[in-house]
Amino acid sequence: MLESPDVAGRAASALAETMPAHVTRAAFHSIAIELPPGRLSSAEVAARLEISEEWILSRTGIHERPMAGPDERLSDYAARAGAAALARAGVDGSELDLVLVATISADEVTPNTAPLVAHALGAHRAGAFDIGSACTGFLSAVAIAAAAIESGRARWVLVVGADFITRMINWEDRKSAALFGDAAGAAVLGPADGEHGVIGPIVLGADGSNGETIMIPNPERKIVMDGPEVYKHAVARMAESTLTALDRSGMTIDDIDLFVYHQANARITQALGERLGVEPERVVDCIAHYGNSSAATLPLALASAERDGRLKPGARVVLGAFGGGFTWGGGVIEWGASGDA
């Protein structure tokens, strides 16, 4: 497992106090999202799959999802989400040291999406690269960004999670075809300044022995997924990484205000909360109107919770994700970003 630097204290009063004094603490300074205007309803999906809409709703909790048009480019949405996040953080693109884009649906195999986003935002001195760990991508990027800030190698980092997954739907597989949507979300990470919370321990893991359980093979580039196996491993791994991250932060389930997990489907989110003994009101569930947009679901969930007033400065938050590979992760943060997402 790859872990963020060891914390020094075990007190649950504040994550900032659990890190050595000489470490530059990293924090979220903003969150923003960008959605395609097109919508694909579950009624439309049901008609195409020749099943009932109720069948979809009962198994996924998804009523509709954003859907990009055939001529729209993922890099444009990633750049717009990034621009909104920069504006909300009061940071200019030229100040960025690093641009990370988590995606498995880039416009081209090469160049990566991140250099295109960096160019669009005027981040001409920033390093830029993509992270392809599927639905875990955004959390993986946050871990890398936090490590760069904490080590002094970067001050401002833009983290983007963006995917157009509807283009990869396998319409022959009704169990997975109803799940996916398109979206982009972005966050600006920088040094904690007392007003923007702090990023605590992030624990990442992977198991390639299950790689064929969910995959997008070449050249077909259509999703192949064993839903029951994904469900079983997703719940177990996200619960495990949540508890590990909490232990490393010196916190418990009761210390956390919100649990923000990858929005795979409503059943997984519900089962995860039940396994951890968390009341539903503390678990963010926004999949009904977004669907599963892979690397974009965590920023979507954070922005949704902030917009609804559930995510406030000072809130202690667990982040968790699970994706193809398998890859997974869990982390603990104190929130500080504010404003309309």
What are these regions, as identified by a protein language model?
Residues 29-32, 102, 132, 157-163, ...:
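Short beta-strand segments
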Residues 2-8, 75, 79-86, 105-106, ...:
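Claisen-condensing/thiolase-fold acyl-transfer catalytic domains that form or cleave C-C bonds
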Residues 148-183:
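Flexible, glycine-rich active-site loops centered on histidine and acidic residues
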Residues 88, 92-124:
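Anion-binding (especially nucleotide phosphate/pyrophosphate-binding) glycine-rich loop
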Residues 52, 74-89, 113, 233-249, ...:
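Short, well-ordered amphipathic alpha-helical segments that serve as non-catalytic structural scaffolds
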Residues 49-58, 108-122, 156-165, 212-216, ...:
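Acidic-glycine-rich active-site phosphate/pyrophosphate-binding loop
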Residues 2-71, 173-236, 240-243, 322, ...:
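Condensing-enzyme catalytic core mediating Claisen C-C bond formation in acyl metabolism
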Residues 94-102, 253-262:
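Short glycine-rich phosphate-binding loop at a beta-alpha junction
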